Amino acid sequence: MALLITSKCTNCDMCLPECPNEAISIGDEIYVIDPILCTECVGHYDTPTCQKVCPITNCIKPDPEHQETEEQLWERFVMIHHSDKL
């Protein structure tokens, strides 16, 4: 499933440059994650880098409205980064 940045976000800028899919952007009040681009770092890292670098506990968590299997996240990774080879 895609990740979600909660209202605990302090706009510290730690997560933005870490996303390998460029799924994080500046929202109206806090950073937001585009669920179409978020793969939870599947295909890149073992754990989501945004969660690793975020200084606020439980600020970035699974988005219950975008539940996906690891297989679906892998498919998205391939489409984002390797669609030219399909």
UniProtKB/Swiss-Prot annotation:
The keyword Glycosyltransferase does not apply. [4Fe-4S] cluster 1 binds at C9, C12, C15, C54. SUPFAM superfamilies: 4Fe-4S ferredoxins. The keyword Transport applies. Binds 2 [4Fe-4S] cluster. Pfam families: Fer4 (PF00037). Keywords: 4Fe-4S, Electron transport, Iron, Iron-sulfur, Metal-binding, Repeat, Transport. InterPro entries: 4Fe4S_Fe-S-bd (IPR017896), 4Fe4S_Fe_S_CS (IPR017900), YfhL-like (IPR047927). Residues 1-29, 31-65 form the 4Fe-4S ferredoxin-type domain. [4Fe-4S] cluster 2 binds at C19, C38, C41, C50. GO terms for molecular function: 4 iron, 4 sulfur cluster binding; metal ion binding. Its cofactor is [4Fe-4S] cluster. One of its GO terms (cellular component) is cytoplasm. This is Uncharacterized ferredoxin-like protein HI_0527.
